[in-house]
Amino acid sequence: MVMFKKLLILLIPFFSLGQNYYAYVASESEDTVSLIKFDGKEAVEAERIDVGFMFAEIEGPHGITVDPSGDFWYISLAHGNPFGTLVKYSTETNQAVARTTLGLFPASMEISAITGFLYCVNFNLHGSMKPSNVSVVDPETMTEITKITTGSMPHGSRLSPDGLFQYSVAMMSGELFEIDALDLKVSRVLNLEKKMMSDKKMDGKMMNHDNMKGKMMSKDKKENMMKSMGDMKHSMVKPTWVIPHPKESIAYVAGNGSDEVIEVNLDKWEVSDRFKTGKGPYNLEITPNGKLLIGTIKSEGKTAIWNLENKEELAIIKNTTSVSHGIAISSDSKYAFISVEGIGGEPGIVDVIDLDSYELVSSVKVGKQAGGIAFWKKEI
């Protein structure tokens, strides 16, 4: 028995050396997706896959996700005439197997392990400032089942750990949306702004403004102006991402405009905490063990790591190039894969961060404007 234990201790390093981690990353300005392989020491681009179907223009692969089985990955092509596309690929061959049309500028997405449906936000980057929607797709048939209206510029589609609720934020209207993944309806909406003027106060200010001009405004005209001002609302928070905690009834939101992380108590459906970040937090992810929160600080080209037990910032790591974007975390909570866009004609970069030492341990070049990123598997 003693000899067996000694042998096992000797073999552990060899088992560790045999571990490979795989992630997919989309390069939005090059219409490619790269398969990244990391052996614990060095990250390499194992394969570069051409995506998109229009030869004359860039289609902008933006959001990417791997299904719970690991057999397929999905990419949203944001640009279209005018609508974007969802494309399904086999992880075995990295060949496209099906596609379907979504809404205006489809972006981030995820699949529920319970319903099996894919939920993709339609960001509507170039459209008018009005509520957009979430496309619900059956990945088996690649059929869009419905579109669910949410807020202006929805982003950051993530499912609750039980797969029963989908969460997204509306960047320009400053709201958090909860969708019942079974009923396919919005169940709750939370305003993320610190302060908000009531319609009554806004109405009073408009009336005072009218009186100063010595004019009377008709009720219809005033209502139309109020509606127009509501449509033009610009959030101070500008939320860009939401991630539910894997073990607790809490979600964290990236306040890209307010330079903060917003903690939301999902039971009470209220903001329970806010803590400051660097300039322009963009994406957030939580390690599967629930201990660490990882955030890209887009405007500074950095990645931050927080201890979720006490909200302490454990590290702020400078990324290899500028414009930090997406995050994918290994299933064993050991590594974070960070996509970094770069600027101009620079290649995108995937940085690998060790979540034990909080150090950047490897980097690999990919296509221009590396953005959406998804962890695929750990292989022994």
Language model features by range: what are they?
Residues 18-380:
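Predominantly soluble domains enriched in secretory-pathway, periplasmic, or organellar proteins
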Residues 4-15:
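Sec-dependent N-terminal signal peptides
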